[in-house]
């Protein structure tokens, strides 16, 4: 099915999608601040421009939207229109994520992905549960991991 917008309108709409200071980033920043952690945001000098960098623990945190980064949860749904386009676009995002995570690990950084579904929606984690998972991972100095509605898991 053809796009209902012309190229210029579609481009304008896509540019309007926030890439920083999103609601999920603000929630996570509040929780990190509440834990007394010092962090930097959107560090362009690191691969993938991590949303949060906690130098003290040599770790970076990404907040990933479930749609844009193809998380297998209830928030991800393949669009009914232009399916091939979207699957290709999202597939490129996933491949870039893998490449960025690998490069960060090679540089000695631990990586945490906090999925959108853990931060918002009907199955989101409570602030208490999310804070516990964050503290457990950041202070525990374990391997790279991800947090979703089911809790914390090692990155595959």
UniProtKB/Swiss-Prot annotation:
Binds 2 magnesium ions per subunit. Binds 1 zinc ion per subunit. Keywords: DNA damage, DNA repair, Endonuclease, Hydrolase, Magnesium, Metal-binding, Nuclease, Zinc. Signal peptide: none annotated. One of its GO terms (biological process) is mismatch repair. InterPro entries: DNA_mismatch_endonuc_vsr, Restrct_endonuc-II-like. Its EC number is 3.1.-.-. Mg(2+) 2 binds at residue 51. It comes from the Bacteria. Mg(2+) 1 binds at residues 51, 63. One of its GO terms (molecular function) is metal ion binding. Belongs to the Vsr family. NCBIfam families: vsr (TIGR00632). Deamination of 5-methylcytosine in DNA results in T/G mismatches. If unrepaired, these mismatches can lead to C-to-T transition mutations. The very short patch (VSP) repair process in E.coli counteracts the mutagenic process by repairing the mismatches in favor of the G-containing strand. This enzyme is an endonuclease that nicks double-stranded DNA within the sequence CT(AT)GN or NT(AT)GG next to the thymidine residue that is mismatched to 2'-deoxyguanosine. The incision is mismatch-dependent and strand-specific. This is DNA mismatch endonuclease Vsr. It comes from Escherichia coli (strain K12). The gene is vsr.
């Amino acid at each position: 099915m053809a796009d209902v917008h012309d190229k210029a309108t579609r481009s304008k709409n896509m540019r309007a999608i926030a890439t920083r200071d999103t609601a999920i980033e603000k929630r996570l920043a509040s929780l990190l601040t509440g834990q007394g952690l010092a962090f930097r945001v959107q560090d362009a000098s690191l691969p993938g421009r991590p949303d949060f960098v906690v130098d003290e623990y040599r770790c970076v945190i990404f907040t990933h939207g479930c749609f844009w980064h193809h998380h297998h949860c209830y928030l991800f749904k393949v669009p009914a229109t232009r399916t091939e386009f979207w699957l290709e676009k999202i597939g490129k995002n996933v491949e870039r994520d893998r490449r960025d995570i690998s490069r960060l690990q090679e540089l000695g950084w631990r990586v945490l992905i906090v999925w959108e579904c853990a931060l918002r929606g009907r199955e989101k984690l409570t602030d208490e549960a999310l804070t516990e998972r964050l503290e457990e991972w950041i202070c525990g100095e374990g391997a790279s991991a991800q947090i979703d509605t089911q809790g914390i898991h090692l990155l595959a």
